[in-house]
Amino acid sequence: MALDGSSGGGSNVETLLIVAIIVVIMAIMLYYFWWMPRQQQKKCSKAEECTCNNGSCSLKTS
């Protein structure tokens, strides 16, 4: 069952697979480095209640 216009032994499938993996990795990184810090920033309403390091802010435990 060869696809029309495919050459090189399923190179189209390999390309789609690589692109899919890259998209998944980028989505995971975006979630951890953008979404998580934003969710943590919402927890602290006042600036003096926040503690920030490495770009991620969270409510002070003390």
From Swiss-Prot:
Intracellular or extracellular location(s): Virion membrane
Induction cue: Expressed in the late phase of the viral replicative cycle.
Transmembrane segments: 16-36
Keywords: Disulfide bond, Late protein, Membrane, Transmembrane, Transmembrane helix, Viral envelope protein, Virion
Post-translational modifications: Not glycosylated.
Membrane topology of this protein: Single-pass membrane protein
Top-level lineage group: Viruses
A GO cellular component entry from the record: viral envelope
Subunit field text: Homomultimer; disulfide-linked.
Family from the record: Belongs to the asfivirus inner membrane protein p12 family.
The protein, known as: Inner membrane protein p12
Organism: African swine fever virus (isolate Tick/Malawi/Lil 20-1/1983)
